[in-house]
């Protein structure tokens, strides 16, 4: 008899069986039912304050990241009714650039952990994460290893995430699915 582990039990207890069309229909229904009550400036302000300004292009340079950061610096205080964006998100090698250029009260986020596919050595993921945090990252976005997940190697996947989280120290770690 096959015994389910805690991950299999959790997935079994929370099945997701909607098609893409059903998800789209449900989202459209939620928007239709709630649009009027949320179509006001306070909602827009909240949404703006949740945004991460992100640059994850293969052509990114220190100069480009510096200029992008400067635009956020220039916006700070320009409209006292609107809070800053949540963060500037970059590749880990640009965290130091953002940290040096940033004067606005905005967090620094980065992708790490073998982004986008998580297909590298655990030691590389840990080192990349630790260096990014040391250079000023407040948040680190880590992709799950989809191969481990699909192969139902949940324990190994979670162990990896736990070790990477340890490398984050006080920085927030956000686990992401890279689907694009």
Predicted regions located by residue number:
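Electropositive phosphate-/nucleotide-binding environments in soluble metabolic enzymes
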Residues: 41, 58-66, 92, 126, ...
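Charged, compositionally biased N-terminal leader segments and the immediate start
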Residues: 1-51
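Active-site cofactor/substrate anionic-group-binding motifs, chiefly glycine-
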Residues: 79-135, 139
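Alpha-helix-loop-beta-strand connector modules within alpha/beta enzyme cores
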Residues: 92-114, 152-179
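Short, surface-exposed connector motifs at secondary-structure boundaries
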Residues: 75-84, 171-174
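Short, acidic/polar
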Residues: 61-72, 122-132
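Active-site mouth loops of central-metabolism enzymes
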Residues: 34, 50-62, 109-126, 147-153, ...
């Amino acid at each position: 008899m096959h015994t389910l582990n805690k991950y299999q039990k959790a997935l079994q207890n929370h099945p997701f069986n909607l098609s893409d069309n059903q998800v789209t229909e449900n989202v459209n229904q939620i928007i239709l039912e709630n649009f009027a009550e949320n179509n006001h400036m306070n909602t827009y302000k909240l949404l703006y304050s949740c945004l991460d300004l992100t640059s994850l292009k293969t052509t990114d340079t220190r100069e480009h990241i510096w200029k992008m950061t400067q635009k956020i610096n220039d916006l700070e205080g320009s409209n006292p009714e609107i809070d800053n964006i949540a963060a500037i998100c970059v590749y880990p090698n640009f965290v130091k650039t953002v940290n040096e250029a940033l004067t606005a009260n905005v967090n620094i986020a980065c992708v790490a952990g073998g982004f986008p596919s998580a297909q590298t050595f655990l030691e590389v993921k840990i080192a990349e994460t630790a260096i990014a945090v040391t250079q000023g990252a407040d948040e680190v976005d880590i992709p799950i290893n989809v191969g481990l997940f699909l192969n139902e190697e949940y324990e190994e996947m979670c162990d990896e995430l736990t070790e990477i989280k340890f490398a984050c120290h006080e920085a927030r770690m956000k686990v992401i699915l890279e689907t694009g």
